[in-house]
Structure formats: structure tokens, C-alpha cells
Amino acid sequence: MSVNMDELKHQVMINQFVLTAGCAADQAKQLLQAAHWQFETALSTFFQETNIPYSHHHQMMCTPANTPATPPNFPDALTMFSRLKASESFHGGGGSSSPMATSATSPPPHFPHATGSFATPSWPTAASPPGGPQQHQPQPPLWTPAPPSPTSDWPPLAPQQATSEPRAHPAMEAER
């Protein structure tokens, strides 16, 4: 009875291999037998052999379809990428967009005095949220509204900070 069970297991593996690799059943059986019925080994062998020229899948594998990984016209795409220059785009509009670019890329240097008093308490909350999620939840909402427009948001947030953390309010007022 174990022979029939082994045959059944082998037939199931062959069918699964055909569905996974998209090959013929006789090729799947040969690969699985060569790999001593180890599915992953046979599958790896199949996909490594598709690069060998005698494989009947070779033409289909080497001529990719127009997928997101292959652009429609590769030389034109290379030409467009070669024309892009990141340094010129940042320095070209540097007069009006450089403060916004620096605040978007690195907010702490843009607000060094306002973040100086909160640098120590805010980093541990980001590093260890599971430790005390109820204690650390009030701090991120106070931190996120500040960077967009500090002059208009700080006075409405100052009374909220005074009620939640009395020592945070004087530090923010002193830095302002």
C-alpha cells in the first residue's frame, strides 16, 4: 500500500510542478526524479535551465513583453534619464525653494532650538512604542503640527502643552 501512496504523492508533486513552472508533465517528472523528489530543488533546476539555448522556452523568456520592468523604448528612457541633473534642479530654484527643501529633508537643523529640548524625550518614544503606548501617544501629535507653520501653530498648541506637560510649555515659550 505504501507504493500506491508514494505514486500518489509523486503524481501530486508532478501536477503541482506543472502548475508552478508551466512545463510539461514529463519534464516535471524528470526534474523531480533527478532532484530526488525535492520540489524546491527541482524548481530551481528548471528555472536555471531556461537560460540554456536548447530549452524550448528560451525564445519566450529572452524576449520580454512590455511590462513595468521593461520600458517601451529603452534608449529614449536612457536619454531622458541622462538629461536629468539633480544638482541643477535643487540649485536652479534655490532662492525660493531651498528653505522648503531643507525643511523637508532635514527638519532638525531647520529648527535646532525648538527641537533641542524635545530631542531626548521624542527619540525614545519612537524607538520604543510598545513599552508605553498610552504615555507616548500625546507627544507625536504635538510634534507633527509644528513643522508646517511654526508661528501660527505654536500659540494654539501652547495651552494644550501646558495642560498635558507643564514643563514642555515654558521650554517652547523660551525658545520662541
UniProtKB/Swiss-Prot annotation:
Question: Composition bias, kind Low complexity: at what positions?
Answer: 120-137
Q: What is this protein called?
A: UBA-like domain-containing protein 1
Q: Which CDD domains does the record match to this protein?
A: UBA_F100B_like (cd14343)
Which regions are flagged for Basic and acidic residues bias? Answer: 166-176
Q: Which InterPro entries match?
A: UBA-like_sf, UBA_8, UBALD1/2
Describe the family membership recorded for this protein in Swiss-Prot or TrEMBL: Belongs to the UBALD family.
Q: List the disulfide bonds.
A: none
List the source organism.
Mus musculus (Mouse)
Spans annotated as Disordered: 87-176
Which residues lie in coiled coils? none
Biased segments, Pro residues type: 138-150
